[in-house]
C-alpha cells in the first residue's frame, strides 16, 4: 500500500523480474507466476473466452464460462471481442486468467481498479476462493481490499528512495 508515485508498481515489477533493482537482488521467487497488471493485456481481437484459452488450454470452455460467471460475466460477454468489453469486464477476464493459471505466486497490481462495489466484492471473493494457499502479492490504494484478501500490509512511503515502512 502507499500513495500514488510511491513505487508500488515498480516494486511489484522488480519482484516479478520484469525490471532490475538499482541495488540488491531479489531471490526466492518461484518461476511459476501469475499476474494481473494495471493494463489488462488482453488480445483485443480475440473473445474473452479465447483470451483465457490462450493461457489456459487445459481447462474446458464450460469450466471457463462458469468461472467467468462467478465474476458476473455472462456467456454472451465471454464471446465478445475483448476490444468491445468495458474496462471493468476486461479487468475481470484478466483476473480470471491469473487466478486459474497454475502460478505459485500471484502478483496483482490494483486488481479491482475501476470495479463498482458489488463487482469488487465478487472479485475479492473470487480471489479468496481461488488462492488455494498460494502466495499473493497485491498492490492497492485501498486498505479494505488488502484486509479482505488477507494480506500482510506493507506501506511504501515516498522519499528520495522508496522504503518499506
PLM region spans:
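ABC-family nucleotide-binding domains
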Residues: 109, 116
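Conserved H-loop
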Residues: 133-140
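Hydrophobic anchor residue at the start of the ABC signature
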Residues: 95
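Q-loop/switch helix immediately C-terminal to the Walker
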Residues: 45-59, 63
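Conserved ABC ATPase signature
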Residues: 81-85, 89
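Helix-to-loop junction immediately C-terminal to a conserved catalytic motif
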Residues: 16
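Conserved ABC ATPase "signature" region
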Residues: 61-77
Amino acid at each position: 500500500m502507499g500513495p500514488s508515485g510511491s513505487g508500488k508498481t515498480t516494486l511489484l515489477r522488480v519482484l516479478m523480474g520484469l525490471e532490475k533493482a538499482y541495488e540488491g537482488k531479489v531471490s526466492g521467487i518461484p518461476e511459476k507466476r501469475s499476474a494481473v497488471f494495471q493494463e489488462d493485456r488482453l488480445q483485443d481481437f480475440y473473445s474473452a473466452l479465447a483470451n483465457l484459452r490462450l493461457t489456459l488450454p487445459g481447462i474446458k470452455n464450460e469450466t471457463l464460462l462458469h468461472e467467468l460467471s462467478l465474476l458476473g460475466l455472462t456467456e454472451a460477454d465471454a464471446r465478445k471481442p475483448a476490444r468491445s468489453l468495458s474496462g471493468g469486464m476486461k479487468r475481470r477476464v484478466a483476473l480470471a486468467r491469473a487466478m486459474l493459471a497454475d502460478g505459485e505466486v500471484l502478483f496483482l497490481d490494483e486488481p479491482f481498479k475501476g470495479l463498482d462495489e458489488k463487482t469488487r466484492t465478487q472479485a475479492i471473493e473470487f480471489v479468496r476462493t481461488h488462492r488455494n494457499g498460494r502466495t499473493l502479492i497485491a498492490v492497492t490504494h485501498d486498505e479494505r481490499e488488502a484486509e479482505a484478501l488477507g494480506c500482510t500490509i506493507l506501506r511504501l512511503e515516498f522519499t528520495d528512495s522508496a522504503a518499506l515502512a
